Amino acid sequence: MTTQSATTATSHYFVENPSTRALVIGAIGVVFGDIGTSPLYSLKECFSKEHGIPFSPDAVLGIISLLFWAMTIVVSIKYVVFVMRADNNGEGGVLALMALVLRTAAPRSRWAKVLMMLGIFGACMFYGDAVITPAISVLSAVEGLEIATPQLSRFVIPITLVILVALFLIQRNGTSVVGKLFGPVMVVWFVTLGLLGLYNLVQAPEILKAFNPYYGISFLIAHSLQAFIVLGSVFLVLTGAEALYVDMGHFGARPIRYGWFVLVMPCLILNYFGQGAMLLTNPAGAENPFYLMVPEPLLIPMVVLATCATVIASQAVISGAFSLTSQAIQLGFVPRMRVRYTSAAEIGQIYLPVINWILLVLVVAVVISFKKSENLAAAYGIAVTTTMVITTFLAAVVMRNVWKWNPALVTLLGLSFLLVDLAFFAANLLKVAEGGWFPLLLGSTAFFLLMTWYSGRKLLRARSLEDGIPLEPFIAGLLAHPPHRVEGTAVFLTGNTESVPVSLLHNLKHNRVLHERVVFLSFVTRDIPYVDDEQRLSCKDLGGGVFILKSDYGFKETPDVHKVLDLAQRKLGMHFELMETSFFIARESVIPSKLPGMSMWRESLFAWMHQNGAKPSDFFQIPANRVVELGTKVEI
């Protein structure tokens, strides 16, 4: 097939396939919101007076050249061509990538621990992104009012806060209704970006010289240290690139690639080159290149459209924070939290009240503290560059250990991408004192909390195993001399089907009865995002009406007792009458001690997190009137 015929076939597929078109438009509305709103502040920050770069046509050409080649190398080549191939059963993102590479490492090895900690730290840095993106995006959009009417400058922060508070308040109701508008609105946004850029570009076509990397390299050589500092601002055009990989599970790789190459990238390039062209004809426009390239009669409509686009970009990272936390809960790094489903049709649309309110408080605090988008720009890059470096490293491990690529090729690609990522990372490190400390502090705090929970759970399991009684011999002895049997079914939720659940021991001790049918139900999280219903359940009959029922779940799924029992009835013929079934749960009270483990204060922190996590009955969606909670104390 020739190149022309291949292109024609691809275009024909896109035009004739309505489902692909819908996915592409959906991806444009969700995946590209962050990177699509970068033109609001990226070039403005590159020409910040603090960088000390003398304004000149060569500086404009050099910076625009760096913007173009950064976008081409990092987004188009690294993410779209290579990283998006590293999917975990169709899912992307640093946690999915971590789960994928951990399959190739020996369990409990030092290498596995390094890979796990890298993945978790990369995920934690996303929380910094989830705080800064809404703040800088909405703030930079509303700042357009200052250009339209300088007298409105004192209202910028109040308007920004009203928009952001409203955005977080509507999360509890879900966004399925307004979410249908996200795609069309963002299509209008990108087309507008492209047209604005084209309008300015034709007035100074010499900006097209910036396609030549010579100008970018010359700029770096001529300005050395100042140019290196500017790289931290150039990186702002790449914020949101990770979303192409993270949201791959929602839309698929093909629609995201279509959206990027057909609409998003061309429009972004046109806009950045248009801003550069405007600066060649109007050097004073460096104050706010985006809004000063807009014809004056269109300024207010542009502020409105930009605000809509930034709200959509903010929604994407908020939803991403909910999804990331849900995955971390299933992987055992975060305490159970109450999860609400906001759409009956879309399983991915969830709402976590605790995360929502934490984000709201932090976002409001950031807007009030930093006041201007240019102040936030210094804080923005460090969170994203950290995640990018980790993603590149883990992707290289996948290339070598999973795909079995030639070591020389992996080294060449891995080092090339890492060199670019580390250059941006180092440039952003120079801004730690100016605001970069904030996402680092936020990400490090989240990492510390997640690792404390993970380590505490390991200690708790170890103590339970030390004191545990082997289940099958115990049941055999119990059935040989059975206590009084009562009608109904008892379901004992347990994390370890090898040992007798503490809840069963307490029930026998205090009630001295055994139900006519006993089921030990265990939920097991696997290293894949979803588990097919055909492979979800396994059952072992211990005789005497006693069963071990294991239910496998992916790390993007939330266990649901109702669905498991329905599935057991359909697939295994195990009939459950909910009102005749009692669910026994052990409620552990963690007691910090001087036993080997964590430091006392970390054990106390873990005990507090354990106490304040969602009740198992709430998390597993069990009717409250069918639950029997039996308390037990465990020293760690």
Swiss-Prot record:
It is a multi-pass membrane protein. It catalyses: K(+)(in) + H(+)(in) = K(+)(out) + H(+)(out). It is found in: Cell inner membrane. It holds the Pfam family K_trans. The chain crosses the membrane at residues 23-43, 63-83, 114-134, 150-170, 182-202, 217-237, 260-280, 298-318, 350-370, 379-399, 407-427, 432-452. Its main location: membrane. Keywords: Cell inner membrane, Cell membrane, Ion transport, Membrane, Potassium, Potassium transport, Symport, Transmembrane, Transmembrane helix, Transport. GO terms for cellular component: plasma membrane. Belongs to the HAK/KUP transporter (TC 2.A.72) family. This is Probable potassium transport system protein Kup. It comes from Cupriavidus pinatubonensis (strain JMP 134 / LMG 1197).
